């Protein structure tokens, strides 16, 4: 992202298509591709074992819960100034140089909707929690309806009040989804979340 989108770098002598920068970018891309292939290979080998473990269900649900909490707190609340010193700060978001922060948030929501939601709602329905399962489905739809209106760069969304209101709407929808999943669904499924489970420590 730095090589492609950093404004200061891309006004200097080493900006693309400078040969050394092209070489470095090619090496980085090949390294990322190699890591991705290696992760996929190892996951495919580990997957059958993982699916058979006693912890599979709880671990998977907690992973989805953690993703939602990180999305709500670190990727939205903190840069919006809703936590900490109360100042808006686009530079603590992912992909801020490229202006694609909110598209990465949409990708996270889409991934959870595609790969996490079906299993979660099936489990809830198995516990006679069909109403809760439907509420969660509907809330995912509410979150997704914020896009593409929320495609602005985070710096713009934080600086312009009309765009900030769009961002606030997205935050509220994600917060409501987090409550439904992390509080109500977790209780219904007897999934215990550890203290500070999304802190990464």
Can you say where each PLM-predicted feature lies in the sequence?
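Mature extracytoplasmic or organellar-lumen-exposed domains after removal of signal/transit peptides
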Residues: 1-201
